[in-house]
Amino acid sequence: YSSAAKRQNLEGALGSDRFTLVEADLREADLVSLLEGCDTVFHQAAQPGVRLSWSDGFSEYSSHNVLATQRLLEATRAAGVRRLVYASSSSVYGNQDRFPTVETDLPRPYSPYGVTKLAAEHLCGLYAENWGVSTVALRYFTVFGPRQRPDMGFNRFFSAILAGRPVVQYG
């Protein structure tokens, strides 16, 4: 969705002296200098979406979701950041044999997108074990509420219903 809508979501934070918006590509930026003085990093950046991750799109997803995360973990370690909170996805679960799943169930992603998010989770674990970078991965499902993505199901369904349009379903 549009960068203008994303910026509008930051409206409350942009006026704070405790918030600095840095727009940069994690694969290219000087991350160590950007992280100086930080004690916690909330890694929310990623290439989202399942459908476009197939075929030719996979290299872009690998680059944005795996390589960028590895670079951020390296910078976190080098800058002495205490903790990294990683935004993962429910897509890592894939097709499970039982529901609800439990922490000990082996993830089985069913899309290249899910594979990249799980690979980045494993990188977080490796940096925690080998370098002492405290990490936690949050496996988001469809996020609903204020500032939700306008291109996701909840928003599309309710917008269509309120406007009297048919609800489009996939799958």
Walk through the language-model features, giving the residues of each:
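NAD(P)-dependent short-chain dehydrogenase/reductase
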Residues: F99, H122-G171
